Curated annotation (Swiss-Prot):
Name this protein carries in UniProt: Alpha-L-arabinofuranosidase C
InterPro entries: CBD2, CBM2/CBM3_carb-bd_dom_sf, CBM2_carb-bd_dom_sf, CBM2_CS, CBM6, Galactose-bd-like_sf, GH62_arabinosidase, Glyco_hydro_beta-prop_sf
Region named Disordered: 300-319
Subcellular location(s) of the protein: Secreted
Length: 619
């Protein structure tokens, strides 16, 4: 259960320090360029015993910085965990880049985060040092609700940065000329569009998977007014964005504008067009961060017809597979097991595959129910990834979570209990989400295991009460996440009154089909299993698919154990989605189910040693 002690709302403090970054060269001890960065140490949240902080490194120079290495030391505070960097040392602490964030392009920044204990003191603001740092800094104060730009990721995460400049692969065209008459550009010149509305610069980006990417446009606007742009992905089929490009004061003064967009798997054509008759500012470069990306093909655009939305599908199904009973699964052994001191179980997982990385939020139990986050790129190394506790963070514990990206708000949402609540973040890798907010007005007693899915017009909130009834609340897409009232989806009071329709409802949209899948956990004569139904609308009616103990959606009776049976029953979990947004799409041709399995008995339910395993549907 959740710790109901409220974390004090402390105004986050930001202190900037200067630090040096190691630049690559013939010898690491000698910098090939006098590249430096400004380091910002941010107290993100603080409570009675601990704190979370972020260190942001910003490249204020005109040259790329490669391979950074920073240090800091506390008087009384101690670091307990961190993310988005490789850490070593025990006060002083050292952080070095991971494989995907070691290069910082001019004007760009990276961040890493940490959690610590105050040890009777206040949250300290240590000086961050490095090998070479000449950049001036100033102090500032940030809102306590600020969200770090980057954060948690396991050491196995892989991503890449792409820099597109004129006369290079991936630069497709400019409606104008390539000029070099103003200093400060970084390539062979800069793109100077015609002074006309609609004049454009076009790039091509090849992404290995669908997902969110961060685009940074380096530009100079020496005019007296904004020269804003309209950014279109694949002709508008995968996104339309407005980019603010204010004046920089001179044509030799370069600044950056950053925007998060959704790219589809394969080739993407990105077009930035002028919205005024003055045309665009001078455009020096476009950089792309997130996932694995490379220069694309200017002559083609990946078809978006098989991708339901800019983030609704990370795969392109080549066939339509009918999901019909009986179903057969194979199970892995335990892939994620308790490894932190005192942890007894890990259960109730929510899993999102985003930018080639699996992100898992889950419940763990030590002396109470708490929450954790982990991420990895390969199931074979899942257990080696850090298990980061969310206990004491701003969001607190988020038992039985569901995580997804809500496109209309351009934010990640986490749905949790008790009572029903939601939290948000701009970065799924950051386990310090916003403070929880109420989800359902008029929520009945005992409501749990909340699940959200949306179509093009409405969002649906499913939940249980351990009373043999499945409930739903409905709101418009524009009104999300505000739900009010509820109705009954179905009820089944056989057995002891709740065992046939128990908990852990999941609802998904099947890729390429006008068909939805509903799963609900049950227990009848033996261990837990899942029943299932399908419908052509989220409003129902729901038709049984595999809904008995003998013919379950997933349970002991239809699972083969490739490495030996280790779990008794198939309990609370999620299918691995083909996308990551609110439409909850799954590929019926390649279903995988991350579930909690009881690996042994417990003296009480709370002490059952649950672990996480993966089911794969047999074809």
């Amino acid at each position: 259960m959740i710790n109901h002690n409220k974390t004090p709302n402390i105004l986050a403090k930001v202190f900037k320090r200067t630090c040096g970054l190691v630049s690559t060269g013939a010898a690491l001890a000698i910098l090939s360029q006098a590249a430096s960065a400004a380091c910002t140490y941010t107290i993100d949240s603080e409570w009675s015993t601990g704190f979370t902080a972020n260190i942001t490194l910003k490249n204020d120079t005109g040259a790329a910085i490669n391979n950074w290495n920073v240090n800091w030391q506390y008087s009384s505070n101690r670091m307990t965990s961190g993310w988005n960097a490789n850490f070593s040392g025990t006060n002083p602490y050292n952080a070095t880049n991971m494989s995907w964030n070691g290069s910082i392009a001019p004007g760009q920044s990276i961040s890493f985060g940490l959690q610590g204990e105050k040890n009777g003191s206040t949250a300290e603001r240590p000086t961050v040092t490095g090998a070479a740092c000449n950049s001036a800094t100033t102090s500032s104060v940030a809102s306590s609700s600020s969200t770090p730009t980057t954060s948690s990721s396991s050491a196995s995460s892989v991503a890449s940065a792409l820099l597109l400049q004129e006369a290079q692969a991936g630069f497709c065209r400019v409606d104008g000329t390539i000029d070099n008459n103003h200093t400060g550009f970084t390539g062979s010149g800069f793109a100077n569009t015609n002074n006309a509305q609609g004049a454009a610069v076009v790039w091509a980006i090849d992404a290995t998977s669908s997902g969110r990417r961060t685009l940074t446009i380096r530009y100079a606007n020496g005019g007296t007014a904004n020269r804003n742009g309209s950014l279109v992905i694949n002709g508008g089929s995968n996104g339309n964005y407005t980019v603010s490009l204010p004046t920089t004061g001179a044509w030799t003064t370069w600044q950056t504008a950053t925007i998060d967009v959704d790219l589809v798997q394969g080739n993407n054509i990105v077009q930035l067009s002028a919205t005024t008759a003055e045309g665009l500012p001078n455009i020096d470069s476009l950089s792309v961060v997130g996932g694995t990306v490379r220069a694309g093909n200017c002559g083609s655009v990946s078809s978006s017809s098989s991708v339901q939305s800019s983030s609704s599908s990370s795969s392109t199904p080549s066939q339509t597979c009918e999901l019909k009973a009986p179903l057969r699964w194979t199970s892995t052994g335990p892939l994620i097991s308790p490894k932190n001191p005192g942890w007894i179980s890990i259960k109730d997982p929510s899993i999102v595959k985003y930018n080639d990385t699996y992100h898992v939020y889950a419940t763990y139990y030590d002396t109470a129910y708490r929450s954790m986050y982990t991420s990895f790129t390969d199931w074979n190394t899942a257990q080696q990834a850090p298990h980061i506790s969310m206990n004491g963070s701003r969001v607190g514990n988020t038992v039985a979570p569901q995580v997804f990206y809500f496109r209309p708000h351009n934010k990640w949402y986490l749905i949790t209990q008790w009572a029903g609540a939601y939290a948000t973040t701009d970065d799924i890798r950051n386990p310090n989400w916003s403070a929880k907010q109420k989800l359902l007005q008029g929520e009945p007693n005992g409501a749990l295991d909340f699940w959200v899915i949306c179509n093009d017009t409405h969002c649906y909130l499913y939940f249980s009460r351990d009373d043999g009834v499945l409930y739903v609340s409905k709101t418009t897409l524009a009104n999300f996440p505000n739900f009010s009232g509820y109705s009954i989806v179905m009820e089944d009071h056989r057995g002891n009154g709740n065992s046939y329709l128990f908990e852990a409802a999941n609802v998904y949209k099947l890729d390429g089909q006008n068909r939805y899948l509903l799963m609900v956990e049950a227990y009848i004569s033996g261990p837990r299993f899942f029943r299932s139904w399908t419908a052509t609308s989220l409003d129902g009616p729901w038709t049984p698919l595999a809904d008995t103990e003998a013919n379950p959606f997933a349970g002991n009776n239809n699972v083969e154990w490739s490495t030996g049976k280790w779990a008794d029953g198939i309990s609370h979990g999620e299918l691995i989605r083909s996308g990551h947004d609110e439409k909850m799409t799954v590929d019926p041709c390649n279903l995988e189910f991350l579930y909690q399995g009881a690996s042994g008995p417990g003296s009480t339910y709370n002490t059952i040693p649950y672990k996480l395993g993966l089911l794969r549907l047999k074809k």
